[in-house]
């Protein structure tokens, strides 16, 4: 655990020491001596600082993490130079454990430098301020932010591209750690942006793909241009102690900063340099104006071409819909024709079945009529048969009348015949009763047409009726 007093002292001295680092070497050395006299004891890796017995303030290093900030990124990676040749990775971690858990530690012992990655950018800034120029085994440590080798500069960004959209667009190439759209002091987009990947392969892939193709971020058809980001140090700059003190250095430093006197040698060439710089500025402005006019002209042509393209697309869509409508109409007509043909076939089949049924009914009726005629002869045929039977019966009676009657034993009933049916022995037209018809049916020769019927026998003597009784017909 660390004393909170020493930590707050270093935070208070952060800005003044950084301000006087380039201009007041003596004040910087005094602060360095204070650091040596009061070295900050390390704190555990859990990220908390417990106060001493006199002070009850506790600082949680997790509070230095911004909302939504990613941890252990390239932005929190520090370069540590002037390391002792015998330093170990464990000593390196122990040196930075005050600022939280370290994610990556690399040491190049032969060249005396290394890299370490902390959790957040804020913790890395605090570690850089406190450990820079700190003596370690006779050497002063040099702590800087490591160059982000996987960062790209994106130009020609459309107006309505935000940080989130830029990150989403470039995340197709790999994991993006940070994406920022650069704006001016009023918050207006400048058309430039920065994209930082977690590794070099993703940055190389994005650079190659965007160089070969046209990567569009919005509906505005202007592709973005991608190039490696220039690694510039705009925080520390070039301190006096890092300037190489060679012969040219001493020659340049012979005179202090001043204004050139008119009419002097240096004034004449200073004015010529100034004219050259002005001409460069004018030409650059002219180039910028030409580029601006060309961009405006291209945008106008693009709008006209876009309108024409939209009209063409609408025409194509209309033609496609008309073709689709015509095809649907043809399909509908074909379906109607098929339905009509099916109905005609069904109607023809129904008529054929009805005709077949009608023919079958007529055939059945004809057969029934023929069968009726064969079983029951008509009235004319029946009348002719009856006439023939009557004529045959009369002829038989006349023939048998000349012959003597056969003797009949007493008590024998008279045989059925016309004598028992009619009193005069003639055949009447009235049909006989069932009993007598049955008796007549037993006679021989009645059933054959044109055959000779048997003769009627004379009645027996006992069959005579009384004088007062009439014979029953």
Swiss-Prot record:
The modification Omega-N-methylarginine is found at residue 458. Residues 28-37 have a biased composition (Low complexity). Residues 270-374 form a coiled coil. The modification N6-acetyllysine is found at residues 5, 11, 200, 297, 373. Keywords: Acetylation, Activator, Biological rhythms, Chromosome, Coiled coil, DNA damage, DNA recombination, DNA repair, DNA-binding, Immunity, Innate immunity, Isopeptide bond, Methylation, mRNA processing, mRNA splicing, Nucleus, Phosphoprotein, Repeat, Repressor, RNA-binding, Transcription, Transcription regulation, Ubl conjugation. Residues 1-53, 445-473 are annotated as: Disordered. The modification Phosphoserine is found at residues 149, 264. It is found in: Nucleus; Nucleus, Nucleolus; Nucleus speckle; Chromosome. Disruption phenotype: Mutant mice display flattened nose and a smaller cerebellum. Behaviorally, mice show impaired spatial memory, as well as a marked anxiety phenotype and increased risk aversion. Deletion leads to a significant dissociation of TET1 from chromatin and dysregulation of DNA hydroxymethylation of neuronal genes. GO terms for biological process: activation of innate immune response; cellular response to angiotensin; cellular response to hypoxia; circadian rhythm; DNA recombination; DNA repair; innate immune response; mRNA processing. Residues 14-27 have a biased composition (Basic residues). The modification Phosphothreonine is found at residues 430, 442, 452. There is a cross-link at residues 5, 62, 98, 101, 128, 192, 200, 245, 251, 373, 469 (Glycyl lysine isopeptide (Lys-Gly) (interchain with G-Cter in SUMO2)). Expressed in liver and suprachiasmatic nuclei, hippocampus and neocortex (at protein level). Expression is strongest in neurons in CA1 and CA3 pyramidal regions and granule cells of the dentate gyrus. Detected in testis and kidney. One of its GO terms (cellular component) is nuclear matrix. The modification N-acetylmethionine is found at residue 1. Residues 56-375 are annotated as: DBHS. Residues 76-143, 150-231 form the RRM domain. One of its GO terms (molecular function) is chromatin binding. Monomer and component of the SFPQ-NONO complex, which is probably a heterotetramer of two 52 kDa (NONO) and two 100 kDa (SFPQ) subunits. NONO is a component of spliceosome and U5.4/6 snRNP complexes. Interacts with CPNE4 (via VWFA domain). Forms heterodimers with PSPC1; this involves formation of a coiled coil domain by helices from both proteins. Part of complex consisting of SFPQ, NONO and MATR3. Part of a complex consisting of SFPQ, NONO and NR5A1. Part of a complex consisting of SFPQ, NONO and TOP1. Interacts with SPI1 and SPIB. Interacts with RNF43. Interacts with PER1 and PER2. DNA- and RNA binding protein, involved in several nuclear processes. Binds the conventional octamer sequence in double-stranded DNA. Also binds single-stranded DNA and RNA at a site independent of the duplex site. Involved in pre-mRNA splicing, probably as a heterodimer with SFPQ. Interacts with U5 snRNA, probably by binding to a purine-rich sequence located on the 3' side of U5 snRNA stem 1b. Together with PSPC1, required for the formation of nuclear paraspeckles. The SFPQ-NONO heteromer associated with MATR3 may play a role in nuclear retention of defective RNAs. This is Non-POU domain-containing octamer-binding protein. It comes from Mus musculus. The lineage of its organism: Eukaryota, Metazoa, Chordata, Craniata, Vertebrata. The gene is Nono.
């Amino acid at each position: 655990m660390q004393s909170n007093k020493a930590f707050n002292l270093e935070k208070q001295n952060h800005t003044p020491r950084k301000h006087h680092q380039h201009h007041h070497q003596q004040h910087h050395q005094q602060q360095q001596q204070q650091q040596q006299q009061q070295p900050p004891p390390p704190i555990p890796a859990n990220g908390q600082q417990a106060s001493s017995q006199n002070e009850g303030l506790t600082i949680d290093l997790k509070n230095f993490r911004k909302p939504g900030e990613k941890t252990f990124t390239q932005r929190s990676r520090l370069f540590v130079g002037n390391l002792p040749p015998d330093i170990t990775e464990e000593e390196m971690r122990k040196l930075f454990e005050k600022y939280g858990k370290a994610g990556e530690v690399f040491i190049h012992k032969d060249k005396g430098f290394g890299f370490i990655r902390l959790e957040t950018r804020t913790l890395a800034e605090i570690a850089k301020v406190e450990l820079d120029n700190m003596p370690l085994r006779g050497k002063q440590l040099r702590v800087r932010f490591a160059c982000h080798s996987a960062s790209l500069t994106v130009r020609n960004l459309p107006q309505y591209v935000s940080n989130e959209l830029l990150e989403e667009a470039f995340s197709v190439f790999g994991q993006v750690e940070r994406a920022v759209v650069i704006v001016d002091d009023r918050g207006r987009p400048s058309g430039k942006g920065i994209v930082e990947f977690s590794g070099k392969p993703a940055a190389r892939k994005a650079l190659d793909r965007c160089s070969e193709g046209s990567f569009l971020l919005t509906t505005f058809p202007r592709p973005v241009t991608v190039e490696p980001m220039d690694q510039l140090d705009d925080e520390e700059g070039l301190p006096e102690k890092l300037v190489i003190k060679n012969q040219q250095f001493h020659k340049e430093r012979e005179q202090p900063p001043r204004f050139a006197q008119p009419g002097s040698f240096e004034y004449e060439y200073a004015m010529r340099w100034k004219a050259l710089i002005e001409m460069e500025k004018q030409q650059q402005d002219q180039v910028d104006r030409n580029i601006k006019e060309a961009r405006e002209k291209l945008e106008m042509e693009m709008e006209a071409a876009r309108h024409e393209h939209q009209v063409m697309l609408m025409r194509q869509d209309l033609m496609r819909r008309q073709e689709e409508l015509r095809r649907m109409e043809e399909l509908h007509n074909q379906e109607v024709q098929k339905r009509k043909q099916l109905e005609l076939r069904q109607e023809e089949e129904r008529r054929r079945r009805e005709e077949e049924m009608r023919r079958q009914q007529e055939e059945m009726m004809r057969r029934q009529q023929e069968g009726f005629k064969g079983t029951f002869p008509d009235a004319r045929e029946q009348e002719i048969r009856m006439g023939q039977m009557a004529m045959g019966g009369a002829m038989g009676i006349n023939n048998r009348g000349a012959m003597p009657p056969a003797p009949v034993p007493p008590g024998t009933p008279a045989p059925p015949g016309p004598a028992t049916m009619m009193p005069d022995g003639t055949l009447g037209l009235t049909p006989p009763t069932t009993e007598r018809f049955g008796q007549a049916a037993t006679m021989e020769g009645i059933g054959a047409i044109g055959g000779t019927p048997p003769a009627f026998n004379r009645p027996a003597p006992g069959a005579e009726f009384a004088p007062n009784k009439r014979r029953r017909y």
